[in-house]
């Protein structure tokens, strides 16, 4: 059995954080959808790009509430210069009039939910995990080879990251994923995390993860292994039997 565990050090910095965990199997990453379903997913993404505008009340990206909240969170631990929460990159596309486009069914569904609810979402190939998955504070220098890089980029001491027994999986909380655990066309078992640092939005977080699970089941055949919200009172959960 594999577990997802949020370490004590994380809660000392973010006692009010909540992380929606969705573990799924039998995902058909390379599924070829019929025209009707492909159109439905495109419509979901188009609608999400439009609805995301409600989170953008300022032309200056850093002045918008969602982005400001995450930048404040990132100021509480060491980060690589320029590292930003993943939702900021999506919202920046919308702000600049270059909406997030279609890539692949699961990516499009995930991006649609991320934009609709303004929560960062990350997905990893769970079959590549070595032992349990953790979210916690790094000692610095742990193994990490980012997607698209030709050299390792280890985390800083004190940085928050997802990690397992072999090394870091995602740096700076939800900023950059590693090559080792990347979701590809052959991936069938996935760990998905959706993060919330605003206590008044926990209800929206539950709604978002429920909708994501339903969409992945409907369009790409995903079967839910576990779906749970992690918080300071429930710090771990099973993700693979």
PLM regions and their residue ranges:
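Charge-biased, low-complexity intrinsically disordered regions
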Residues: 1-241
């Amino acid at each position: 059995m594999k577990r997802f565990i949020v370490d004590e050090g994380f809660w000392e910095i973010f006692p009010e954080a909540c992380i929606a965990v969705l573990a799924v199997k039998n995902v058909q990453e390379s599924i070829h959808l019929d025209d009707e379903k492909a159109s439905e997913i495109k419509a979901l993404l188009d609608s999400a790009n439009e609805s995301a505008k409600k989170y953008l009340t300022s032309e200056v990206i850093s002045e918008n509430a969602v982005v400001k909240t995450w930048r404040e969170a990132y100021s509480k631990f060491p980060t690589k210069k320029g590292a930003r929460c993943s939702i900021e990159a999506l919202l920046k596309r919308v702000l600049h009039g270059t909406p997030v486009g279609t890539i692949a069914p699961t990516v499009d569904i995930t991006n649609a939910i991320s934009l609709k609810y303004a929560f960062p979402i990350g997905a990893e190939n769970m079959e590549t995990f070595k032992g349990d998955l953790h979210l916690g504070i790094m000692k610095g220098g742990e193994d990490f080879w980012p997607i698209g890089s030709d050299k390792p980029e280890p985390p800083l001491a004190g940085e928050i990251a997802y990690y397992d027994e072999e090394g870091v999986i995602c740096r700076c909380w939800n900023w950059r994923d590693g090559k080792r655990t990347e979701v590809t066309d052959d991936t069938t078992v996935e760990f998905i995390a959706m993060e919330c640092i605003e206590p008044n939005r926990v209800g929206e977080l539950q709604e978002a993860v429920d909708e994501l699970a339903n969409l992945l089941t409907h369009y790409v055949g995903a079967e839910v292994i576990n779906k749970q919200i992690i918080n300071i009172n429930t710090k771990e959960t099973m993700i693979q039997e």
